[in-house]
A protein has these predicted regions:
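A compositional/structural signature for long, glycine/proline-rich flexible linkers
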Residues: 1-141
């Protein structure tokens, strides 16, 4: 809120920041983009995403390097999402960050300084009011 709109309705610093980064201009009712710097080392990490994420459209996890850019790599893709990702038998999805050498599904190869952005399109009231959050990425056990 306060990012885009009439001169009277915006918060100047939010407006400047959002226009500088160039994306994220949709209102929160249409999309939310939590950016996460997990402070985890390069290794095998994962997020266990439940079968039902309270969004009206879809969700995605996008991987970035420490400069906020996609990192060139041998494996395809910089994103795992609810449309193209492989689901577990119970409908949940395991998103792997690191440990991709064995060809596992839904895996994003990580690098030093990695971070990620979760994109939630048409977030439900649970997300908007903060009673539901996307599962954290944790070291694999």
């Amino acid at each position: 809120q306060g990012t885009f709109g009439t001169r009277e309705s915006v918060i100047p610093i939010r407006h400047l920041i959002r226009t500088a980064v160039g994306w994220g201009g949709l209102p929160e009712t249409e999309a939310m983009y939590p950016a996460i710097g997990p402070n985890l080392p390069v290794g095998e990490n994962r997020s266990e995403v439940p079968a039902e994420v309270p969004v009206g459209a879809f969700w995605s996890v996008r991987l970035y390097n420490d400069e906020g850019c996609f990192e060139p790599k041998d494996l395809d893709g910089y994103v795992v999402n609810s449309i193209m990702g492989e689901r577990n038998r119970d409908g949940s999805m395991t998103v792997h960050l690191g440990g991709c050498d064995d060809g596992r599904e839904n895996c994003l190869p990580i690098m030093e300084g990695w971070n990620y952005v979760v994109r939630l399109y048409q977030p439900g009231p649970e997300i908007l009011e903060g009673s539901w959050t996307f599962p954290d990425v944790e070291p694999a056990k």
